[in-house]
C-alpha cells in the first residue's frame, strides 16, 4: 500500500508560516524561562525546508475517505531551521569555567550592575526519529502523538559562538528545552495548524472569540470621579472642587465615592442589624455569610464542672423505680452533688440512658447496647418496684430532679416494710416480730460515716410493728425516733428531703451495719487469725544490732 505525501504546499504558504511563528512564540514563553533570560523569546524566522520527512507504516487501525488512524515510524534529516531572538543578562565574574570544584569557589558571584546582551539563536540540522500515532479527520483535524523522544541532534548557533563555554551551555540548555517542547507543545501546535487547513470554520470561530476579548477594554472605576461624589463625611462636593482635586493629584480623586453607592451600602448594613427579610441588591457585589466567634453557639457555651446526669429506669407492671444522679440542685447551691435520690414513678419507661447535661438528646431514655452492664439481679428490681407500690398515695409522682418538702414526715399507721440484707444479697421485706427476735446491739464504729447520714438513719432504724403486736413494744422505738427527729431538726435546721431519700439512707446504713456486724463476728469467732496479722516483721526486715569489736 502506498500514498503520496505532498510537502510543497506547506513550504509555499505565507499565512501558514505566520501562524506557526505565533504559535511557537506563545509556546516558548509559556513555560518558565531560565533566570539568565530577561526578555521574551521571539520567533523571527521559521522554515520547514524542501526535504520532507520519511514515514513508514507500521499499523493501520481505521481507514476511510474522511478519516485515518495509524502508527508510523518517522525519520527526518532535512534543511528546516528556526531563528529566535531574546535578551540575556550576563555576569562577567561567573565564567562557567568548571576547571575548579564548585565547593572551592565562592558563590554567588555577582557584578556591580547587570549586563544585558541581545542574543540570537538559530536552530538547524535537526534530526528526528520517533514512533508516532497519527489520527486524521476532516471534522477534527490532525492529531500527532510521539511515543518516544523524537530529537536525536541539532545544531545551535548564537552570537556567543566565539566563547566556548557559552556555546556549550546554550547547546545543553536548548536541547533540553526543545525536547520538552516537542513532547508537550508540538502536538497541540500541529493540531491547530491542521484545523486552519481542513476546518477553517472552526478557526474563524476561535479568532472571533479572541477578537471580542481584545475589544473589551478594562474600565477603571477610579479614573474619573463619580457624578455625585461625596467626601469622607458624606457631604456632597461641588464640581469645582472635584476638578481641582483631579488637577492637583490622583490620590484624593480615588478616595471619592458616589453618594448613591454609599446609600446602598448603608441599607445593606442596616438589614444585617434588624430582623428585616429584605436584602437590597448591590450590583457587582458578592454576598458571603460568615459566622464570627460571637455567632457560634459552641463558643459562648461553657463546659459544666459536674459530671453528666445518670438516669436508670426499670419497668415492672406499669411502675418504675428511677435512680437519678442529679446535679441541678447542687449547681444552684454552688456545690457538687452529695448523694443520689430515689424517685418512684408510675410510668412504663424502660431502658438505660446516659445523657450529658449540656448535650441532652431527645432519645436519651432509649435503651442502648451493652454500654452499661447491670450487675444487680432481677430480684432486686422486683423488690424495689414492690416497695414503690406499698408506699403511701400521699407522696405524689414527681418528674423533676429536686423536690422540696416540709420537715414533718407523715407516718402511716399501716405496716411498714423493712429492708433486710441476707448473705445472698437479696432484698426482702420482714415484719417487726421477726426483727425483734434478732439480738439487739448497737452498730460498731458508727462515727466512721457521715454524721448527716448517721442521724438520718436513726429516724428509720426502729421498725414499726403490725397492729396485732402490743403497743408497749412499739412505744419505745417511736419515742426514740421522735426524739431523734427533734434533736436532729434543732441541730441541723430546716431541710427538704423526701421519704424516698430517707429510706435510701436507712438502707445504706443498714448495709453498713450488717458489714460491720459480720466483721465483728468473724473476729470473735477466730481471734487467733487476726492476732497473727499483728505479729512482728520477719527477721529479714529487722535492724541487726551492731556488736562492738572485741
UniProtKB/Swiss-Prot annotation:
The organism's superkingdom is given as Eukaryota
What this protein is reported to do is described as: Component of the ERMES/MDM complex, which serves as a molecular tether to connect the endoplasmic reticulum (ER) and mitochondria. Components of this complex are involved in the control of mitochondrial shape and protein biogenesis, and function in nonvesicular lipid trafficking between the ER and mitochondria. MDM34 is required for the interaction of the ER-resident membrane protein MMM1 and the outer mitochondrial membrane-resident beta-barrel protein MDM10.
Question: What is the protein's name according to its record?
Answer: Mitochondrial distribution and morphology protein 34
The topology of this chain with respect to the membrane is: Multi-pass membrane protein
Instruction: Outline the segment boundaries, as ranges, of region: Disordered.
Output: 294-313, 358-505, 519-550
Q: Subunit structure, briefly?
A: Component of the ER-mitochondria encounter structure (ERMES) or MDM complex, composed of MMM1, MDM10, MDM12 and MDM34.
Cite the InterPro entries for this sequence.
Mdm34 (IPR027536), SMP_LBD (IPR031468)
Give the UniProt record's GO annotations in the biological process aspect: mitochondrial genome maintenance; mitochondrion organization; mitochondrion-endoplasmic reticulum membrane tethering; phospholipid transport
**What keywords appear on the UniProt entry?**
Lipid transport, Lipid-binding, Membrane, Mitochondrion, Mitochondrion outer membrane, Transmembrane, Transmembrane beta strand, Transport
This protein's major location comes to: mitochondrion
Composition-biased stretches (Basic residues): 364-376
Which positions fall inside the SMP-LTD domain? 1-208
Name the gene: MDM34
Q: Name one GO cellular component term.
A: mitochondrion
* HAMAP family, sorted: Mdm34
Task: Quote the biased-composition stretches of kind Polar residues, using this chain's numbering.
Answer: 391-407, 458-467
Ranges annotated as biased composition (Low complexity): 300-310
> What's this protein's family per the entry?
Belongs to the MDM34 family.
Skewed-composition ranges (Basic and acidic residues): 481-495
